[in-house]
């Protein structure tokens, strides 16, 4: 199960944390055993994972120019995590492919260097896209318990409160930066993408609030 700062939903759902600017892999076995393959900065977070997991260090999952001591081939790390040749192996990214051409099980949205390593470790013919297990029509994340619903409602409320706060403060002469600063709250990541623009949007390709 793959995760990075922009594609952390499935990874974070099971581990409780996102790997920020590093890549990360959660390897789950049928018997419940788990391993987390992570970079330098996330080794300390493995002990806090919701799913108890063995920590396996992969230095090149780290940011560029960080220490690379102890690096080993990724396929070797995957085998240590439990990926075995000839065993059916599911690779979970973040996107559910819904094409009608019958090839979705062999489309992968995970970085190619990781996909290729998984295929080398398990055998290319034994690797399939398994994202549907989490976000498919009958996926685990499609059913929410009361606690999850409360968290999603909290995120939704923060987002809508931010919009109301900005709308009520709107007055002539305010800049996009001033209004944009009202869209987030409580130091939380917003559950939607915040956009604050006035007048012609995307001037010179800029997508972010300015001081105009």
Where are these regions (language model features)?
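Flexible loop/turn segments at secondary-structure boundaries
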Residues: 6-10, 44, 97-99, 202-205
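Charged, often glycine-rich, active-site loop that binds/positions anionic groups
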Residues: 11-16, 141-148, 209
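N-terminal accessory/capping or targeting/presequence segment of soluble
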Residues: 1-72, 76
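Flexible, acidic/His-enriched mid-domain "rim/lid" segments that flank
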Residues: 65-191
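Acidic, glycine-rich loop-and-beta core segments that form the ion-binding/anion-interacting portion
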Residues: 180-212
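Residues in well-ordered beta-strands of folded domains
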Residues: 37, 56, 90, 195-197
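Acidic/histidine-enriched ion/cofactor-binding microenvironments in catalytic or ligand-binding pockets
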Residues: 18-22, 27-31, 83-88, 111-121, ...
